[in-house]
Design a protein with these regions (language model features):
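Membrane-proximal cytoplasmic juxtamembrane segment of single-pass receptors
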Residues: 1-115, 120-151, 195-201, 207-208, ...
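Intrinsically disordered, low-complexity cytosolic regulatory tails
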Residues: 69, 111, 251-252, 271-357
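Activation segment
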Residues: 189-191
Length: 357
């Protein structure tokens, strides 16, 4: 009797999951539903791995129409199928040039797969740091990347039906297409917020070195979109300076990028933060570099209220607005030395929509 009841429960569970997935498929503008076999064939039996993260592996694939895709195969979904489908519907409905597009999904037999557009230049971290191939990016391209990231965040924070706080903005989560257009990916830690709600109460999440000060309080304070603004400021500094925000291979006086900004600001020598300036950028770029560093400092203010909205950042980047002049360069968060392995995000995730971590 127990076995029969369990079998019936399993059948009902499977039916309910399929019905939920069918509901998504019927909503115009939402991701396409693929069968497991469709994606197994598209990925040649999941043979070419693009990346692996805490929630699954990402494989390269080609759909029947010739479209190149990245397919994320989730390791553990279990009883989270309902929340998985709800998030597919929510995140799949967002559409912006500077966000990696979720093309489709598969929900069969308690397994979940996500199908994303394929970005053939890979992640930003491969292109911007010295001693990597990234040293070839010129100033114009770096400018283009910065503006693209900023526009993507404006859409998430201000233009979506529900505001989306990403929580994990970093070079690894910025992908580049063939023309070096930046697209934000990995919504694995993101949180959807009603438009009439300005703050959320949440646990600490994100990647060490990119996490805003208010997220590190015990217990964490009330969180707003300004946590993404802070992370953007760190990424902007890394793009401009062509170095990581914390580099344990450097002397102690130079291993923390925020401390260097603080020190050089006190000396009125912000330009000195960029090493080998003449080798990396044109001499004429100096004023623009200083302006970019000031934008980053604006985004990195300890007090979230003093940080700009990303729409203001875009206006400054586009030259239609001036950067805030009354900036505080004492970054108390800079006194905290990040862990050596600052690429590691905490394991708990609010979402499974991530490609690739």
């Amino acid at each position: 009797m127990i076995l029969i009841l369990r079998a019936r429960w399993w059948e009902e569970s499977e039916k309910n999951e399929d019905l939920e997935a069918d509901d998504i498929r019927q909503v115009p503008g939402t991701p396409v539903r693929f069968s497991y076999e469709d994606l197994r064939v598209a990925t040649h039996d999941f043979s070419e791995t693009l990346g692996k993260g805490g929630s699954g592996s990402v494989f390269k694939g080609v759909l029947l129409d010739g479209t190149h895709v990245a397919v994320k195969k989730l390791d553990r979904l279990g009883q989270d199928m309902s929340s998985f489908l709800a998030e597919v519907e929510a995140i799949g409905s967002i559409n912006h040039f500077n966000l990696v597009r979720l093309i489709g999904f598969c929900a069969e037999k308690s397994s979940g797969l996500l199908v994303f557009e394929y970005m053939n230049k890979g992640s930003l971290d491969k292109w911007i740091f010295k001693n990597d191939q990234g040293s070839c990016l010129d100033w114009q391209t770096r400018n283009k990347v910065v503006l693209g990231i900023a526009k993507g965040l404006v859409y998430l924070h201000e233009d979506c039906q529900k505001k989306i706080i990403h929580f994990d903005i970093k070079p690894l989560n910025i992908l580049l297409d063939a023309n070096f257009n930046a697209k934000i990916c990995d919504f694995g830690l993101s949180e959807l917020v009603d438009r009439d709600t300005s703050q959320v109460q949440t646990r600490t999440r994100g990647t060490c070195g990119y996490v805003a000060p208010e997220c590190c309080k015990i217990p964490p304070g009330r969180i707003t979109v300004k946590v993404d603004v802070y992370s953007f400021g760190i990424v902007l500094l890394e793009i401009v300076c062509a170095r990581r925000n914390f580099d344990h291979t450097q002397p102690e006086s130079e291993n923390h990028l925020l401390r260097m900004v603080q020190k050089k600001a006190e000396q009125d020598r912000l330009i000195d933060i960029v090493e080998n300036l003449d080798d990396q950028y044109m001499q004429s770029d100096r004023e623009e570099i200083i302006r970019m560093i000031k934008i980053a400092a604006w985004c990195l203010q300890d007090d979230p209220e003093r940080r700009p909205l990303m729409s203001a950042v875009v206006k400054v980047l586009e030259g239609v607005m001036e950067v805030e002049s009354n900036l505080v360069y004492k970054f108390h968060h800079a006194l905290i030395t990040p862990a050596v392995n600052h690429h590691t995000s905490p394991q708990p995730q609010a979402s499974v929509l991530s490609y690739p971590r």
